[in-house]
Structures are given as C-alpha cells and as structure tokens.
Amino acid sequence: MAEHELRVLEIPWVEKYRPKRLDDIVDQEHVVERLKAYVNRGDMPNLLFAGPPGTGKTTAALCLARELFGEHWRDNFLELNASVSADTPILVRRGGEVLRVTFEDLDSWYFGDRGGEYVDVSDLEVLTVDRNFRVTWARVSKLIRHRARKILRVHLEDGTIELTGNHAVMVLDEGGLRAVKASEIEEGSFLLSFVAELDEQPTDGGTVVTSVGSGSRVSDTTYELPVEVRVELLRELADDGVIEASEDVSVDLAWLARISGVESRVTDDGVELVWETRTGDLLPADPVLKLVERLESDLVDDLESWVFDGRVSKEAVRKVLSSVDAKNLRGDARRAYRMLRTLVRSDVHAVKVEDLDVMDYDGYVYDVSVPGNEMFFAGEVPVLLHNSDERGIDVIRTKVKNFARTRPMGGARFKIIFLDEADNLTRDSQQALRRIMEMYSDACRFILAANYSSAIIDPIQSRCVVFKFTKLPESAIKERLRKIAESEGVEITEDALDAIVYVSEGDMRRAINVLQAAAALGREIDEDTVFQIAATARPEEVREMIHHAWNGDFERARELLHELLTRYGMSGEDVVRQVHREIFDMDEIPEEAIPELVNAVGDFEYRLIRGSDERIQLEALLARIHALGNEYSGG
C-alpha cells in the first residue's frame, strides 16, 4: 500500500476535522448563538436537536460539553452505544451462500463508503436460537455501528470475543435466557455456545478445503457439505484432535466443527477438536438445580453429585427427569419440568469465562438486529449475544441511572447525557426516559438528537428546548471540503466537488467520508472517482433510464438498469432512492403523474426491504413507469 494511502486511511477525517468549538460549527449560526448563551451562564436546560443527518447535531453536543466542562468534559458526558469489535468473526448466510466473515466485512458490504450508524439489510441471515434453544438461521433487518474508545476482551475456555462493556450477552437462569451486560460478567461466569448438526442446501460450484496451508481459507462451499462429509473432512485434517493452522483458518474450522456436531476450541497453535468428554453436553448447574428443586427437593441431592466445576451434564439431568412422574405435575413444577426437558434437548451449552481485559480501541463496533428475538452467535467460537443498540428501555433504566447518580467532575453543577437518533427510541423507552429526566433534573441535562422531532413523544418535547438544524447548503459543504483537501494535500476538481455534494445530499459527514475514500486512491479526485467510490450513479444516467421506460423503450431501460448495478455496485434500495430523487426534475413527466410515480417507488422500496429479489423488483418498477408513461401519453 502506498505511503499516501496509508496516511489517508490512518484517521477518519470526520473525527480529525470535527469542530472542537461552537464557533467552528458550519452554517448553523442560529444554533451556535443560543448554545453560547448557555455556556456564558454555566447552565442549560434539556435540549432536543432536530434535523437531517450530517448537519452537526452530534458535533454541537460535543462542543457544548467541551466549553461547559473544559478538561473534564469526557467525565461529565455520556453518549450511549454498544457493540462488538470489527474483527469479531460471525457465520452468515447471504443469498443462500454460507460465509464465515467478520463485522468489518459486513460493513464493507452494506455501509460501503456511506456514513451513518444504521443500514437496512435484506439479504443476510445469522445463527440464533428458537424458543426450544435449537440453533437456526434468522433474518437480519439492520446492521448497526458506532465508534468506541474501549472494548472488553473476554477470554473463554474455547476462544475469545471482543465487545463493549455495555453489549449484552445471553446467560441462562431458571426463567430461561436472560441478557446481561458484558461488564457484569466475571471470571467463572458461564456464557452460552452451541454444538449442532446443521444441514445446508449446497450452492453450485466452489472447491472444498483439503489442507490448511498458510494461504488457504475454508471455502464457502465446505460449510454446505452434508454433515457426515464435513465430519469426515475434520477427522482427516486433525492430528490427535489438533489442527495446526493460521488464525483465520482456525476460526473457520472452529465454526465448521460447531455446525457439524463437533466441539471445537481455538488455541494459540490452531484449533482443537473434542470428540469425547465434551463440554458441549454441559449446562450451568445453578439454574438447573433451582429448576429441579421446583420438581422435588430430594432430586436436588441426586443431581448435585453430578455437578463439576459449576456445570452438570445434560445426560445427568435426563436421568433425573426419567424418575419424575410428569403427569402429576402442576403449575410451577410443570413449567420447571418443561424447561428442563427443553434444555437437555437443546443445542446450547455452558462455556466458562477464564479472564477479562479492558483494552484501548479506536474504530467502529457493530451489532445486528434480528427481528423476533434480537439474539445472534458471534466470536472465535460462537457465543450467544443480544442486540445491544443502546436506545432500548433497559439502558434508559440502568446505564442512564448509574451515570446520573455519580457526582459531576471538576466542580461542574451537572452532567450531560446525549442520546443520538432518539427518534428510534420505542415509546416505552421514551416514557422511561421522561421519568428519568424528572428524577435526575438536578444532576443531569439531556440532549436528544433526532432526524424527526415528531417521533419524540410530547411529554419529552415539552421538557426540552428545541433546536432546528437545517440542511447544509452546497456552498458550505464545498468550502469545508476544500479546506480539508488543502490540509491533506489532495487535488480535487470542481466537478468532483459537485459530485460529492450530489451524493451526500446535505450530509457533511458523508461528504467527508466520500472525500477521504476517494483520496485513498492517491490521484487527483474527479467526478468519475466520486461516483464510483460512493456507489452512486450519475443523475443523468438515472434520468436516461427513466426516460426510456417512460417513453416506451422498456428493453433499453432494462439494459441501463443492469449497467448501473454492474458499474457502480448499487443496491436495489440505492437505485430506488435515486429514481425517487430524479423524477421530480424531469420535464417530460407531467406534474399530475408524479404522485402515482412516488406511490410506485414507495411500493417497490417496501418490497425490497422485505427481502424480495432486487433485479425482479427493479425491473418491475421500470415496467410500472413504462405503463404510466403509456397511460399519460395516450399510448
């Protein structure tokens, strides 16, 4: 990699050039003047920052905290987020193909060069558990990310996982699965992993790994082989149960083993396969004993004799259950019996925490949203995690309370709690937040940032002073980009600046991200580079496609669509958004047709979000435009 490219990629320019003082915020003078008045007073009310993404809401909150609290601003400022680190391994299924990747790979697939913390996902599945604790695939609806400065490395007996202290891991208690913060676990705690036999439908083509040399990886098609073939392959690779391999291959093989019914452990030298004396048959003893006690207290003594190192085997529990007359059980005892039966038949087992380290970190951390249960497996060996996006009711009731109870540092009169994208809070979470705001009004001030203030409940709006952040004008974005380019020694054409303004749509954060990504190529930035980097088509190309569809040349419109998808690597939702953007500026489309076109675009965007085939839906959208063109032209 060239020296210039290394320098460009070293620090995200969004952070490097983020304003540190209120006076440096771009083109929000009406906001800045009001905030400076609070600094002069040394006090402030609760605030609601409302406006489009990338207009300075987060920056304004950070600048306000710096000027109010000085060197102690970090101690007195809480920004809520929680996720796993970028290099955390995860097994996914994308378009029917099973892949062992990292969250950094998911970032490149779905965020690309776009800014933001959320992206909708329609073609991705991850491993989770069903209500019987059996491992299964489940659809992902969103990929979530944010930046973190500290992470927690959890050393397990089978491998490691890195996550923020606020990320939730799943544990087992007598009521079933329960989410707890990673910061609450300690040496000797038990997390949940799995060993299961998952059969896949093989895709065509591909090769199978037959060796584990330094440059190899387990091929994607290997995960799709029949279970018995995978097991035989693992036996052939293993020497006395150990496969010496690189770190990546070791993790590949560990996951391959786990979905093939073989227990695996990642070690410094490779991966160890466990054929006998499996911890994969063990459950945490404490919740199991409590459940057994509900059946019959005498059975507890029988089961305790099987407990070792805080765990008990599923077989021992099964033997105890065989002596229970289930027909005569009622109420709580019957529920306990059902839970125990579910556990002994489940794929999950207890994995012990051996050590924990807090580490410095500078980068994105991630989460996925899994509709239905919000649980997913990730790690060197799979660990059951819970989506910990911090705008949920649990954080409102716990983390905010804990932070609010501590004394402000540096003689400050209050602390600031910043909730970004607060319009994504559930109504229950907002009601909880309202009560917290009332309870800690003396010690804390809240800043809520939202794209849409209308999504914030009235009781919260009435407790806040509202600041409206306006969409940044093109001139302000261009001026900022020119200064950054000059500071970094990057040459950029005027056409390229226009292109960045177009793709960023008033979002300064995205504009700077696109500039940095384009600069990494190490040459003068022109408009071709910008559109390619941003995975965005030129507006005239989209208008040409719409023109042909509207005027009856469906085949040509279809050809142009496929060119856009191939040349720019655009997603279906990207295409739909650009079509929506361009139809308003096309003189040939009569004004009375616009509402019908907008309605059609909305229909097809919804279908894509729901997971429909992209090409089919995009071609169907062109067909709808074609039909409307015929209707309005009298054809």
Curated annotation (Swiss-Prot):
Molecular function terms, GO-annotated: ATP binding; ATP hydrolysis activity; DNA binding; DNA clamp loader activity
Family of the protein in this entry: Belongs to the activator 1 small subunits family. RfcS subfamily.
Gene Ontology CC annotation, any one: DNA replication factor C complex
Processing after translation: This protein undergoes a protein self splicing that involves a post-translational excision of the intervening region (intein) followed by peptide ligation.
Keywords on record: ATP-binding, Autocatalytic cleavage, DNA replication, Nucleotide-binding, Protein splicing
NCBIfam families xref list: intein_Cterm, intein_Nterm, PRK00440.1
Name by which UniProt lists this protein: Replication factor C small subunit
Source taxonomy: Archaea, Methanobacteriati, Methanobacteriota, Methanomada group, Methanopyri
UniProt binding sites for ATP: G51, P52, P53, G54, T55, G56, K57, T58
CDD domains in UniProt: AAA (cd00009), Hint (cd00081), HLD_clamp_RFC (cd18140)
Pfam families: AAA, DNA_pol3_delta2, Intein_splicing, RCF1-5-like_lid, Rep_fac_C
Xref: InterPro entries: AAA+_ATPase (IPR003593), ATPase_AAA_core (IPR003959), DNA_pol3_clamp-load_cplx_C (IPR008921), DNA_Rep/Repair_Clamp_Loader (IPR050238), Hint_dom_C (IPR003586), Hint_dom_N (IPR003587), Hint_dom_sf (IPR036844), INTEIN (IPR006142)
Subunit structure: Heteromultimer composed of small subunits (RfcS) and large subunits (RfcL).
GO biological process: DNA repair; DNA-templated DNA replication; intein-mediated protein splicing
Entry superkingdom: Archaea
Keyword ATP-binding: yes
Protein task: Part of the RFC clamp loader complex which loads the PCNA sliding clamp onto DNA.
